[in-house]
UniProtKB/Swiss-Prot annotation:
Post-translational modification: Contains 3 disulfide bonds.
Family recorded in the similarity comment: Belongs to the CRISP family. Venom allergen 5-like subfamily.
InterPro entries reported for this sequence: CAP_dom, CAP_sf, CRISP-related, V5_allergen-like
Described purpose of this protein according to its UniProt entry: Shows trypsin inhibiting activity. The protein is highly thermally stable, since its incubation in boiling water during 10 minutes does not reduce its activity.
Tissue specificity note: Expressed by the venom gland.
Lineage: Eukaryota, Metazoa, Ecdysozoa, Arthropoda, Myriapoda
Protein name: Scoloptoxin SSD43
Secretion signal span: 1-20
Species whose genome carries this gene: Scolopendra dehaani
GO MF entry, a single one: serine-type endopeptidase inhibitor activity
Keywords, alphabetical: Disulfide bond, Protease inhibitor, Secreted, Serine protease inhibitor, Signal
Cell compartments where the protein resides: Secreted
GO cellular component: extracellular region
Length: 211
């Protein structure tokens, strides 16, 4: 798939940004503070699950701490700037280090879109039967893929993008994850004492997660 090389046009009179897809944006991109917040929120939720603090969900022995990846973030930002609530193609999620990344997306008008997006993905935990953690498989009638990706143990990198449409005020948040999860018949994470199966030891910043 060929992507259009886009440019950012700043319209001084209205402070709009226009990308190659024709979407006019009143806001776009994440600054360092926003990146740190969404990364921290992901890791705190992973830590919550790993340490057995999520009701009905077992502890995890091998869940990794997530780290920010600029290539994932650049792809996610391009996805957000389409201002379309639609998953991107494999080509649009491809990275040099990890191959094709996983993707979660959000569109809405809440005042805190970054936190809202992650919270909505995580809330799918209420429909997760713990039995599926040992051998993941899709089951009809429940949307759980965003949560499963959020807590997939072997995922170690994340990058997110953000854009707000000037036309309707809709905010778009896309996060890309690598290595991606949701592999059928693979474990989401290994049950056991938190961080007991870490290959490189336990995270000092997020005890219960692996380095």
């Amino acid at each position: 798939m060929n992507f259009v090389i886009y440019g950012v046009i700043v319209v001084l009179t209205s402070q709009l940004y226009v990308d190659g897809w024709g979407c006019q944006m009143s806001e776009r991109g994440l600054d360092k503070k926003m990146k740190n917040k969404i990364l921290k929120h992901h890791n705190e939720l992973r830590q919550k699950v790993a340490n057995g603090q999520e009701r009905g969900q077992p502890t995890a022995s091998n869940m990794k701490q997530l780290r920010w990846n600029d290539e994932l973030a650049a792809n996610a930002q391009r996805a957000a700037e389409r201002c379309i609530f639609q998953h991107t193609s494999d080509e649009g999620r491809k990275t040099t280090k990890y191959g094709v990344a996983g993707e979660s997306m959000y569109a809405g008008t809440f005042s805190n879109p970054l936190k809202t997006a992650v919270d909505m993905w995580y809330e799918e935990v209420r429909d997760v039967n713990p039995s599926i953690l040992d051998s993941y498989d899709y089951y009809p009638g429940a949307v759980i893929g965003h949560y499963i990706q959020l807590v997939w143990a072997e995922t170690e990198a994340i990058g997110c993008g953000y854009a707000k449409s000037a036309a309707d005020g809709e905010s778009y948040v896309f996060c890309h994850y690598a290595p991606h999860g949701l592999f059928p018949q693979q474990s989401v994470y290994k049950r056991g004492s938190p961080a007991s199966a870490c290959k490189k030891g336990q995270s000092s910043r997020y005890p219960g997660l692996c380095k």
